[in-house]
């Protein structure tokens, strides 16, 4: 498997240890991958999912990195990569009847978003 290295016109941002299931975050990232920054923000604002808050925060950070570090215009940016990887689970216990305890796993994930300058081809 080959991995693509970020190019000179790509800026990245990572959100680590975000509370939420990786599958629930991925269903939102699948919707915004490949879209422009403006379209993605509008979509995230009106989606009814709890994970849109942290995703919006990471997306804004990636765009700020592109503006500050690379001098790119936010209007010309597209979301080139958007991934969610599994983080560690926090283990908690729920007391149950007759002295039993049920395990509860509170899942976390790592969100990575890369934005690139839009090419006119």
Curated annotation (Swiss-Prot):
Q: SUPFAM superfamilies recorded for this chain?
A: Ribosomal protein L22
Gene Ontology molecular function, alphabetical: rRNA binding; structural constituent of ribosome
Name of one Pfam family that matches: Ribosomal_L22
Task: Provide this UniProt record's keywords sorted from A to Z.
Answer: Ribonucleoprotein, Ribosomal protein, RNA-binding, rRNA-binding
Q: Which InterPro entries match?
A: Ribosomal_uL22 (IPR001063), Ribosomal_uL22_bac/chlpt-type (IPR005727), Ribosomal_uL22_bac/org-type (IPR047867), Ribosomal_uL22_CS (IPR018260), Ribosomal_uL22_sf (IPR036394)
One GO BP on record is: translation
Extract the Gene3D superfamilies matched here: Ribosomal protein L22/L17
Which GO terms of the cellular component aspect does the record hold? Answer: cytosolic large ribosomal subunit
UniProt family annotation: Belongs to the universal ribosomal protein uL22 family.
What this protein is reported to do is described as: This protein binds specifically to 23S rRNA; its binding is stimulated by other ribosomal proteins, e.g. L4, L17, and L20. It is important during the early stages of 50S assembly. It makes multiple contacts with different domains of the 23S rRNA in the assembled 50S subunit and ribosome. The globular domain of the protein is located near the polypeptide exit tunnel on the outside of the subunit, while an extended beta-hairpin is found that lines the wall of the exit tunnel in the center of the 70S ribosome.
What binding partners and quaternary form does the record give?
Part of the 50S ribosomal subunit.
Q: What is this protein called?
A: Large ribosomal subunit protein uL22
């Amino acid at each position: 498997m080959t991995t693509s290295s970020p190019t000179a016109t790509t800026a990245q941002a990572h959100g680590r240890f975000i509370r939420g299931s990786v599958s629930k975050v991925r269903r939102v990232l699948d919707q915004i991958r490949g879209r422009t920054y403006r379209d993605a923000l509008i979509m995230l604002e009106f989606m009814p999912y709890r994970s849109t808050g942290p995703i919006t925060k990471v997306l804004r950070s990636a765009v700020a990195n592109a503006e500050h570090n690379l001098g790119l215009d936010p209007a010309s940016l597209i979301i080139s990569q958007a991934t969610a990887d599994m983080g560690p689970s926090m283990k908690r216990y729920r007391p149950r009847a007759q002295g039993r305890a049920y395990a509860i796993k509170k899942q976390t994930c790592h969100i990575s978003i890369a934005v690139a300058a839009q090419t006119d081809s």
